[in-house]
């Protein structure tokens, strides 16, 4: 098994440790403190599942931070 997973994050290629969770990716990108929607392979990953959803080689991830204002 490969030690890295080659994934796409918001349109950019990225290598992450094999088995990294969506929550781990958010932490690596400093997005773990802000509200953030996550989608893996066009499927929404609820916040409660982000720590247990692991990333695999070839996954396409979209992370969208939520910003309020008016």
How would you name each of these model-derived features?
Residues 1-69:
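Ubiquitin-like/PB1-type beta-grasp interaction modules and other compact soluble beta-rich domains
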């Amino acid at each position: 098994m490969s030690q890295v997973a080659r994934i796409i994050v918001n349109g950019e290629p990225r290598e992450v440790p094999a088995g990294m969770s969506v929550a781990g990716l958010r932490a690596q990108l400093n997005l773990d403190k802000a509200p953030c929607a996550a989608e893996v392979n066009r499927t929404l990953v609820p916040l409660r599942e982000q720590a247990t959803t692991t990333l695999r080689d070839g996954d396409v991830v979209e992370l969208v931070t939520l910003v309020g204002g008016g």
